[in-house]
């Protein structure tokens, strides 16, 4: 999803084996061939990704801003967080100016650079999958060769946004006239945009954003997860729902997510009506208190996906 992905919604999908599924030798060929489940590039949002199953080593390439992830099951890493949005000039800054639009339209409203951030993570489940040696070799290569497009992170979780501000921290920079009442420096117009995270679960060493106050990190259990193709379709195989027992998360809605910063557009339906995330992957109704991830319960997770 590149450039003008404003208003895009990716929902109810199964992604797997999208990052070089077979063993390989880390090198230039692998660098140019490695993939991920979803790639969102230099867009200003809003881009909504909800109720998906992302099982590849690399879940989301997020060289962009204005993305909301809601009720997903994620086993791969976020890559290109904070990088991948310049034109690549060798000696001077070269940020790309990309278009944003009028709300729910195709008319260009303006052009702006990417500050990164302005992302939301609500009610997701992060499960660290075993890291294949070949993927670790590639991550070591790409993470240490000065690559400013893709560092090939293979650790899952929201921790890649460590150092990004909360909304309150970001907003405080603008106190007084043009921020002159703030204790911070004059970087407020160029620093990263804020991040929101709540209701997320982390397993197998998946790592939470440092400022997520209600993250649940399970260090007791080991979650197994895979997909199986049977004669009649694809099924999820996991013990995850033997471990998740409580329904502690609230229902997320358009109002929870707010507006994407640059286009000032909400995460809503194409007709402008609000979205209430009160149904799971299969359309099962969620109670007032619900569970993170794409399914309401173990029974739902055992249904045929496709």
Feature names for model-found ranges:
Residues 1-250:
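Glycine- and acidic/polar-rich repeat regions and solenoidal domains
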Residues 2-4, 36-37, 44, 267-271, ...:
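Generic hydrophobic/packing signal
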Residues 288-306:
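Short, surface-exposed, low-complexity cationic segments
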């Amino acid at each position: 999803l590149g450039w003008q992905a404003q208003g895009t919604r990716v929902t109810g999908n199964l992604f797997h084996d999208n990052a070089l599924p077979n063993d390989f030798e880390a090198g230039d060929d692998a660098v140019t061939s490695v993939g991920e489940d979803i790639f969102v590039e230099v867009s200003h949002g809003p881009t909504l990704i909800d109720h998906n199953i992302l099982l590849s080593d690399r879940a989301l390439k997020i060289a962009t801003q204005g993305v909301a992830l809601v009720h997903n099951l994620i086993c791969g890493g976020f890559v290109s967080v904070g990088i991948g949005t310049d034109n690549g000039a060798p000696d001077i800054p070269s940020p790309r100016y990309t278009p944003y639009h009028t709300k729910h339209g195709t008319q260009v409203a303006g052009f702006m650079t990417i500050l990164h951030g302005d992302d939301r993570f609500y009610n997701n489940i992060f499960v660290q999958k075993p890291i294949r040696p070949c993927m670790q070799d590639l991550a070591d290569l790409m993470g240490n060769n000065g690559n400013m497009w893709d560092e090939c992170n293979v650790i899952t979780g929201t921790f890649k946004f460590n150092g990004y501000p909360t909304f309150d921290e970001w907003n405080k920079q603008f106190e007084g006239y043009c921020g002159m009442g703030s204790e911070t420096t004059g970087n407020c117009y160029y620093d990263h945009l804020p991040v929101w995270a709540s209701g997320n679960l982390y397993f197998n060493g998946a790592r939470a954003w440092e400022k997520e106050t209600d993250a649940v990190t399970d260090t007791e259990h080991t979650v197994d997860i895979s997909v199986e193709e049977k004669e009649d379709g694809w099924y999820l195989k996991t013990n995850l729902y033997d471990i998740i027992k409580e329904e502690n998360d609230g229902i997320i809605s358009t109002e929870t997510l707010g507006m994407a910063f640059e286009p000032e557009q909400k995460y809503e339906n194409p007709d402008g009506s609000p979205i209430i995330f009160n149904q799971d992957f299969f359309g099962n109704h969620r109670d007032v208190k619900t569970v993170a991830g794409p399914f309401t319960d173990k029974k739902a997770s055992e249904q045929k996906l496709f």
